[in-house]
Each structure stands twice: as C-alpha cells, then as structure tokens.
Regions:
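A structure-centric signal for secondary-structure junctions around beta-strands
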Residues: 33, 57, 78-80, 141
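A conserved hydrophobic position in a structured secondary element of the catalytic/binding core
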Residues: 63-64, 86
Length: 167
C-alpha cells in the first residue's frame, strides 16, 4: 500500500506535461480542490478507488476534492497530458452559492473517453485557461476565472449522459 500525501495547489493550478520517460508517483495523493486530467498522447495508468484505469488519448478523469489517487507509467515510455486543479473558491468569484451547489452535483468523479472532436475542443479550453495564466494586467484574473468556468461547463457537458466509468 502506497503512503498518502496531501498535494496543495493554489485556487487554480494548470500544467501541461509531455514526458518521454517512465514516471511513477511515489505516493498516493489528494488535493483540496477538483482535478481534471486530460490525456493527449501515450499511456498512463490512473489508480482510484481500488480500480486501475488505462488512460490514452481522449480519456478524461474528473476527481473531487480529497479523492485519493495516483498514476503510473508501468510499461509506457511516453505520455502527454494537461492537468487542472481548482477550488470552489476560484469559481465563487463569478458563481452564486446556488450555482456552485448545482455545479457540485453535476461535476461527479468519472473517467470518460472523448471523441477526437471533443478532445480537440477540450484541449482548446485547457490552452485558453493556460494562456490567461501567462498574462497579467487589467482584468486578467477575471479572464482566468471566466475561461475556467467555460472549461468546467464543457467537462460537465461531456460527462452528462455519457457512458462513464463511475468512480
């Protein structure tokens, strides 16, 4: 059994990674915010709730705050992904308490496979959020939060009514 560790992030944390070598997380971990993990290439193994999910291009995992998880490369030499972690506080800048409650009901833990068109659109949303974090100045924080909400709403759209592997 792997050890568990808390992995804190700011209200919004986004990272693109293209890794050309094996990488196994040394410990299980959790965050105090949501995580959205989008596979863009290669292969990665996500362990959550005693289930191993094989993630390849187009696979998206949604995890809630404090969901314990970890990932491994196993036999895969390469993987490419975007990961986004965010707190409800980041969304509360633009959403009402009732809107947050409704979103909490809709943003459920799952692993879904997106078709190529959905994958490309989701990638565009990730790039937009990432791009706004590289800018500063007048209204930059509002742009960051607006792009985040757009991405989250597309995640909800992609996971509603789809065949998901429930977590």
């Amino acid at each position: 059994m792997k050890r568990k560790a808390f992995s804190p992030h700011d209200d919004i944390y986004i990272q693109y990674l293209r890794n050309m070598e094996k990488h196994d997380m040394p410990v299980q971990h959790y965050h105090d915010g949501y995580e959205i993990f989008l596979m863009l290439g290669g292969k990665r193994y996500l362990f959550y709730d005693n289930i191993c999910f094989t993630l390849e291009r187009g696979d998206m995992a949604v995890l809630r705050p404090f969901d314990i998880h970890y990932a491994q490369s196993r036999d895969a030499e390469y993987y490419e992904r975007f990961v986004l972690n965010f707190s409800e506080t980041a969304l509360s800048a633009l959403l009402s308490r009732e809107e947050l409650r409704l979103l909490r009901e809709k943003l459920v833990p799952c692993v879904v496979h997106l078709n190529e068109e959905q994958t490309e659109l989701m990638l565009d949303f990730f790039k937009r959020v990432n791009g706004y974090f590289e800018k500063s100045g007048f209204l930059s924080e509002k742009l960051q939060h607006t792009a985040l909400i757009q991405l989250v709403m597309y995640v909800v759209e992609c996971t509603q009514g789809e065949q998901t592997v429930g977590l």
